[in-house]
Amino acid sequence: MSHQLPDIQASRPDVTVGLSQVGVTDVDKLVKIERDGETPLVLMAEFEVFVDLPSGRKGIDMSRNMQVIDETLEAAVSGSVSRVEDMCGDVAERLLEKHEYTTTATVEMTADLVMHEDTPASELPTQNTISILASATATDEGTREEIGAEVIGMTVCPCSQGMSASRARDVMHDLDIEDETIETFLEQVPQPGHSQRGHATLTVTADGSPDVDLIELADIARDAMSARIYNLAKRPDEDYMTYHAHADAKFVEDCVRSMAEQVVNSFEHLDDDAVVRMKQSNDESIHQHNAHAEREVTLEQLRAEVSAS
């Protein structure tokens, strides 16, 4: 074309309202995570990338912006990556540099990570999938990064279990079994309760890069539920999972509080201004609704609450 096309995106909008996030979603990239002395992990990661838009600008130059985003992501993922949250931070900072009209750049990444483990009783090799959650927000004041995981486990309802134990106690009383024997039996043989598949999410956000291990976060979230679950389960494994879940029945509230306690105990080195996000959602087995509990809190406040328990 012989003439310059108008830059519509740079024009003034009819309604001068600023937008907090404008960008692209569902951007798939291969990410290779280097590990000292071990085979690198290769992830198919999905990115969401946003910048803010001032009130006097109509748009973000979507096509050109996508090229910038793609080049920036490609440069980040093609290099040596040891922490995905640092990679997100690098992308966010580069985007902030390349957009003179923006004050905030946000990058979010999700990916599935497959881990090798053994079943709890039969000790057979199997695989476990955890969802990696990483993000970063860059501003002129600095960059905050988030890392965490979403995992699946099993919970048992304490209320339902309590009713079953009460019924068992009444039956044994009617059979003239001594109280001490009844209580010993109930202690050693947890009574049935309705179960749920639990979805636990645990993330930590801090200035720069949170000094936490992704796998440790996943383990804390898994162990906060009544029991871990496994893709492969022979009969001894099914018995193990069922027994241990019923021996540690928990509400969704209990799961979040278990995460809170373990985070405080495990990450004493983190600064007080780190933010912890804990979430538990359970798929109910006997209800048409599901159960949910969550908390987002600074580590300073969480430490104070846990120490007061």
UniProtKB/Swiss-Prot annotation:
Reactions performed catalytically: GTP + H2O = 7,8-dihydroneopterin 2',3'-cyclic phosphate + formate + diphosphate + H(+)
E.C. no: 3.5.4.39
GO molecular function: GTP cyclohydrolase I activity; GTP cyclohydrolase IV activity; iron ion binding
GO-annotated biological processes: tetrahydromethanopterin biosynthetic process
InterPro entries hit by this protein: GTP_cyclohydrolase_FolE2/MptA (IPR003801), GTP_cyclohydrolase_MptA (IPR022840)
Site feature May be catalytically important, where: C157
Cofactor(s) listed: Fe(2+)
Quaternary structure annotation from Swiss-Prot or TrEMBL: Homodimer.
Similarity remark: Belongs to the GTP cyclohydrolase IV family.
Protein's UniProt name: GTP cyclohydrolase MptA
Record gene name: mptA
